[in-house]
Amino acid sequence: LNMNLVFRLIWIVIKCLSRPVARNPKLPSRLNFRVMPTDCDLNMHMTNARYFSFMDLGRVDVMLKTAIRHGFFKERWGPMIGTSFIRFRRALPPFTKFQLVSDIIDHDDKWIYMEQRIEVQGELYAVAYFKGLFRAPDGNVESHRVMQKLNRSELVESRTELPTVFYQMEKVSRQIQ
């Protein structure tokens, strides 16, 4: 684990835990970062793996600033990613300021669906979609319990139709097995 990421993680944890749980969390969550030379590959742009690492930080931010953190700490929920898909649109050179935008799109009985975007001055540089869940010591946590902790009434009841990208992502992931 890169020390650069450890310091960023520590900063997010301190920032989130020093504040009370958001009663009505503002999602999407927005985090600002800068590409450091240690985030870059030989082509002198942010390495592909680092996008996923930053997105991990975004999901930690969503979890810790909301009441999901009570499930994480008190009920020992562990976040798990089932499927991820990313589309790179533009390269991020060193020292570029960017914003990571993380949002929960929907859920079904088991899975929670997220979209995360990396933007520079509002312009899309990468977009990723994740299907994940929380696992407790006694098994998977039903997604509606997670949504209740978010206190977002529009997401407590799952929609009947997910955005098309999630169906396509699932179809591709099943072909890879």
PLM feature spans:
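HotDog/MaoC-like acyl-thioester-processing domains
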Residues: 2-19, 92-97, 103-177
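Catalytic strand-loop segment that frames the active site of acyl-thioester-processing enzymes
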Residues: 4-58, 164-177
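Short, flexible turn/loop "capping" segments at secondary-structure junctions
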Residues: 27, 78, 149-152
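Short coil/loop residues immediately preceding or within conserved phosphate-binding loops
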Residues: 30, 81-83, 113
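Solvent-exposed, flexible loop/coil residues
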Residues: 39, 46, 50, 76-77, ...
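Generic detection of intrinsically disordered/low-complexity segments and helix-coil linkers/edges
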Residues: 45-48, 82, 105, 160
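Short alpha-helical interface patches
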Residues: 49-57, 68, 144-150
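Hydrophobic beta-strand-centered segment that forms part of the acyl-chain substrate-binding groove
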Residues: 62-106, 127-129, 133
